[in-house]
Amino acid sequence: MDEEARAAGCSPAPPRAPAASCGAAAELCLCSPTGVEGIEQVPGCPCFEDAGAVVVSGEAPEGPGVLCSEDGAELKLAEQGALDVRLGSPAVGIHEQQLLHRGTSGSDEAGAINEISPVEVSPSEASSNLDTAGAIGGSPLMLESLPETSDTRGCEQEVMPGVVVGSSNRDASSEVGVESERGSDADGRNGLGEGELVSSVDGGGAEKSSKVTGVLSEEGVDGMETALEPCVASVGSITQVEEGVDRMETSLDDSEASDGSTTQDFDTDVETESSGSSIEEQDMGYGVHIPHTEQAICEVARGNKSSEVKSSDRMSSVTLPTLILASGAAMLPHPSKVLTGGEDAYFIACDGWFGVADGVGQWSFEGINAGLYARELMDGCKKAVMESQGAPEMRTEEVLAKAADEARSPGSSTVLVAHFDGQVLHACNIGDSGFLVIRNGEIYQKSKPMTYGFNFPLQIEKGDDPFKLVQKYTIDLQEGDAIVTATDGLFDNVYEEEIAAVISKSLEAGLKPSEIAEFLVARAKEVGRSATCRSPFSDAALAVGYLGYSGGKLDDVTVVVSVVRKSEV
């Protein structure tokens, strides 16, 4: 599909001058779910300076692929906690690899909005680029004193697709034994409507097939021209049919879309069986910023598909393994934007849907809340998914288009929306928010930033047609893969190789996705505050002629971490 990119937003302003030097080596502090009453500052930790204390707690769904109940249960708030993870030796040295020219959101750069000529982006330029951003200089990233993993309060859906479902079909002249298989195909992906069965009757003669109200049946005919003899005589024995029950026990932690306001800590927990739901809010009332986190275990019905093996007198099922997606998120606004909630937003919804958005900061010069449009996009995406009960037939760009159509606030934003269907990750992207797929400790796939130039990303603005802007991805995933989805606040400050190393070591240590997201958010903030650390943003600035620029780029940071796991059924 030809993609068009049109200019929206403002021309980039020169990057800011280096700030006062901070220590090159600093301890990185994180939060873990150990219940605390407030925020404890750690001496010597740059991450807790000013109003950006990194205490994140909570668990809620990402994740990409939360299996929701039939009625889309609401969420229930739970307890908060804190995690302390220390960085033994932060990477502050000079790496020797080729510089990566990255596009970044101009949300923090001063300047007025200028008229920009349209720039065409060819499909080849919009393709995935697997080049890395460079190695980490200095001491390697080390994780020390990693906390013990707490029990995940997620839900796991136990699906029994291969169980024989049945009842005996009777008519006036015959009583037959029927073997039926329910394929858990409520969304119609396997060609059957909800409630449809595949039935077979074993007889001793010719077979004929007929389709009756969604039921495919094979009737045994014993040479009779007018009617069947009683089936007890023609079949010989009646196969007992057992009815299988798809049992779903789901626990979702805070699948609410982030509204961008992170001055309070929200923790939700809902246990859903059938159609029950409950909501309980806890306002912790902290006077300082607490990043918003979500933790979720999302199970997608991949194991509902089965292959059939037929013989003369039986039909058995071979069930594929079910994959689940455990996801967690953390968000930290720019220190100067804490009161307004920052300009980032994200959502994690049912059935493997999630996304991030980054409002363009230049709108604030016109008196417009730059984060409001981004939050409306994420809220609209979640609403579209929930109203369609997981949107099994909807594409990611369709969900985004529906959200963009319903947004009412002026503004523009970068945005990424993704969906995991149990086997394939589908994603659409506009701008320099992006994702990394990490497999076996290495970057397997990644999105490519869509920019007009340095620090000038492509954006979607109110009234734009997303179908003309999006870059689409489809990636097969397997057990053990990790997906890191984030705004440019992460990718401008943390090298991709370092992100992959954090993911690998954290998973080995048994950390939950939300704890990994907290670590990455805190690391991005640490580099962003530094005037001396080398960063992907400083590399890109030097590459386009901003000589002498060093340090990171302090910005809003939002991270969603998802891990593909096999269901323990």
Swiss-Prot record:
Positions with biased composition (Basic and acidic residues): 179-188
Catalysed reactions listed for this entry: O-phospho-L-seryl-[protein] + H2O = L-seryl-[protein] + phosphate; O-phospho-L-threonyl-[protein] + H2O = L-threonyl-[protein] + phosphate
The protein's Enzyme Commission number: 3.1.3.16
Domain of life: Eukaryota
Pfam families, per the entry: PP2C_2
Binding site for Mn(2+) 2: D358, D488, D555
Cofactor: Mg(2+); Mn(2+)
SUPFAM superfamilies named in the record: PP2C-like
Cofactor binding summary note: Binds 2 magnesium or manganese ions per subunit.
SMART domains hit by this protein: PP2C_SIG (SM00331), PP2Cc (SM00332)
Protein family per UniProt: Belongs to the PP2C family.
PANTHER family: PROTEIN PHOSPHATASE 2C, PROTEIN PHOSPHATASE 2C BIPP2C1-RELATED
Role according to the record: May play a role in responses to biotic and abiotic stresses.
Record's protein name: Probable protein phosphatase 2C BIPP2C1
Species, as recorded: Oryza sativa subsp. japonica (Rice)
Lineage start: Eukaryota, Viridiplantae, Streptophyta, Embryophyta, Tracheophyta
Gene: BIPP2C1
